[in-house]
Amino acid sequence: DLWMPIPPSSYLAINGAEILFNLSASNELIAKSDYREQLVLQQSARAIAAYIYSSSGVFESTSDVVFGGDCLIAENGSLLNRSKRFQRENNIIYADIDLLNLKNDRLVNKSFADLYDDSISQLKVQTVSFDFKEINKLNNKKIVLDRTINPCPFIPINPETINKRCAEIFNIQVAGLAKRLEHTGIKNVIIGVSGGLDSTLALLVCHKTLELLNLPKENISLSLCLVLVLPIKHMTML
């Protein structure tokens, strides 16, 4: 699947599959493991799906190739779990997959929806219906999630990566504002400054944009915004 120009799992994803399983027989070569991981991550991101990959174990062949039993679980470009290779015992890996998040990402991705046309919809795909709720009833156990959700998903842990991410955000805003000013022919900007982080960032973006367009900084006008918050003891609705 992963080694083909157009992976068959792509067609399954377009037809609605959200979890893709790949039972593979990928032999081990120097540096192939890292490349295999990148293929799994890329396909899960391209298909906006969860991709579960399981390769043959060390006892698979007596020929001149070696298998490592590599197992990976990825979700939309992120690696959720991976096994140790070259294990001589059976091992199981598992991960919590956010299906609702995958559904939402597919809904907002216009390119993904555009791929679904009559030719793809007519492909022979075997569909097996089941209900997760019914499976939970059979299990008779309370499901405890092992996945930890990052409360700050847009803030990298690495300080160097944080600086790079912030610079990218800043440059995107500058480029967007510069394009708008050039398109409209406007050479002056007015900013409502409240003293908070948002207005401070807006001021910095305007300063950099005027510098980029070779316009004088005096073209920035500031408007002081005051917000008065009073305690409400009684409220009357008309």
What residue ranges belong to the model's regions?
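ATP-dependent adenylation/nucleotidyltransferase module used to activate substrates
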Residues: 1, 161-238
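CN hydrolase (nitrilase-like) catalytic-core segments centered on the catalytic cysteine
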Residues: 3-93
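Flexible inter-domain linker/hinge segments
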Residues: 90-181
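Generic secondary-structure signature for well-ordered alpha-helical cores
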Residues: 45, 49, 82-85, 107, ...
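Short acidic (Asp/Glu) and glycine-rich catalytic loops that position anionic groups and cofactors
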Residues: 20-23, 150-155, 185-186, 219
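Structural beta-strand/beta-sheet cores of well-ordered domains, especially the beta-sheet scaffolds
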Residues: 47-49, 67-71, 75, 90-95, ...
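Short acidic, glycine/serine/threonine-rich loops at helix termini
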Residues: 31-35, 62-67, 84, 106-108, ...
